[in-house]
Amino acid sequence: MAKSKFERTKPHINVGTIGHVDHGKTTLTAAITMVLAKKFGGEAKSYAQIDSAPEEKARGITINTSHVEYETEKRHYAHVDCPGHADYVKNMITGAAQMDGAILVVSAADGPMPQTREHILLARQVGVPYIIVYMNKADMVDDAELLELVEMEVRELLSKYNFPGDDTPIVIGSALKALEGDQSDIGEPSIYKLAAALDSYIPEPQRAVDGAFLMPVEDVFSISGRGTVVTGRVERGVIKVGEDIEIVGLKPTTKTVCTGVEMFRKLLDQGQAGDNVGVLLRGTKREEVERGQVLAKPGTITPHTKFTAEIYVLSKEEGGRHTPFFQGYRPQFYFRTTDVTGAIELPAGTEMVMPGDNVSVTVNLIAPIAMEEGLRFAIREGGRTVGAGVVAKIIE
């Protein structure tokens, strides 16, 4: 079959492999790129190429991640694979690689293991919306009943963490056999089956521009005779001249109207997701708006002070704290563009948190922040990043 030119016209989806160490995440990643490149074009990557993951920084945290891409019949996928467990934890908490869905790799020979559980929990906490399972190493299991047993265990585990275990696609195969070009059910055909499951089970994500307008406030100026201009990068949605806007966070929510949008000193009739713009606000005084607030479509986001979060605490080697912290620890939480002090409540039975740990906590901020589940933040002490987190559930 002739390789067609690599086209960007297909919808773009972000995925990644998760699962226990040595269950075959990287081998599967290599197999997917190789098998799909043969059929749909794109670049095959070897195990060694994927395994030598380069370092990258996200929110002041160094993470090793490999990025590959591949085509299926319907879509173009960007796929992340991490070499170590700590890299997965950091990746998922910082949102460095935002996933529209995850491929959970479980060894059919071993069944679910501690990190299988931890990655499913993390996926739930950080808002990975869909999981598909690849039961790997099926060539090492002769007993069909054992395969069924492992499949049942995986489904139960997914259901336990509020994923639809009974409806989750589970593909049985051997990534190694697929890499070797094996044509039996567990070889190459299992990769096509996985690709078809990705295409049908993970819905196309909403594009940023289709969301409700949101723009974090970076700077505020007053222009004599024109009013107050707020600058920032539009995170999602579109803002048009004449539309109502709410100013949310830090202070009581106020309403105003957008009377102008400018970009590179030119006036526009609208600004959209990704644009760095200045938004002119009617009748708003300069001191009524500050960095750390957001401009938003009315009624779409609310300010909160108390929430549960999944956090990762940097190790000493990563430039983090050298000592553990305890109940009532009060660092700054950096949301979007500003720091807000808050107190951390540890879960029952947890005395302290060591550098390098990840933990579920409850946070009480001293001032409200425009917040929704899945919002990322950094934890800082005097401007130095000591951790990262993601809002799991809003309390008040």
Swiss-Prot record:
GTP binds at residues 19-26, 81-85, 136-139. PROSITE patterns: G_TR_1, G_TR_2. Residues 60-64 are annotated as: G2. The keyword Zinc-finger does not apply. SUPFAM superfamilies: EF-Tu/eEF-1alpha/eIF2-gamma C-terminal domain, P-loop containing nucleoside triphosphate hydrolases, Translation proteins. HAMAP family: EF_Tu_B. Monomer. This is Elongation factor Tu. It comes from Nitrosospira multiformis (strain ATCC 25196 / NCIMB 11849 / C 71).
